């Protein structure tokens, strides 16, 4: 994570609804998407929502600067577009968003960000 710790998904997911996001902070859509996530995090964190954001950015310094003020868990895969983790989730393009239920089951691959809040509420 941005503090130099190895933060595993399992350490934040236990008993929580988790939004997993594969992203690239250098992309032009990233700030708007993070604002949307911020709104959702503010509204639903107390109800059990966690966000686990995986950056595939090449530039570690840019990533640290972009992620340092975000309240959720932000990690970076140094393999970037060759990420084995992204391959496990069949990520072909960014952003890629998934929702895990409180038992850690993958319940949704989000195709429409406009429906993200409804998708989260249905799992909370």
Regions inferred by a protein language model and the residue ranges of each:
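A short beta-strand-turn-helix
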Residues: 1-18
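Flexible loop/turn segments at secondary-structure boundaries
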Residues: 6-7, 28-29, 59-62, 82-84, ...
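Active-site acidic short loop of glycosyltransferases
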Residues: 14-15, 46, 91-94
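Conserved redox-active cysteine motifs that mediate thiol-disulfide chemistry
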Residues: 17-39
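Hydrophobic beta-strand anchors of alpha/beta hydrolase catalytic cores
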Residues: 19-20, 51, 97
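Structural microenvironment flanking redox-active thiols in thiol-disulfide oxidoreductases
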Residues: 31-68, 80-86
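Short acidic-hydrophobic, aromatic-tinged amphipathic segments that line or gate anion-handling sites
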Residues: 73-78, 110
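Thiol/disulfide oxidoreductase modules built on the thioredoxin-like
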Residues: 81-123
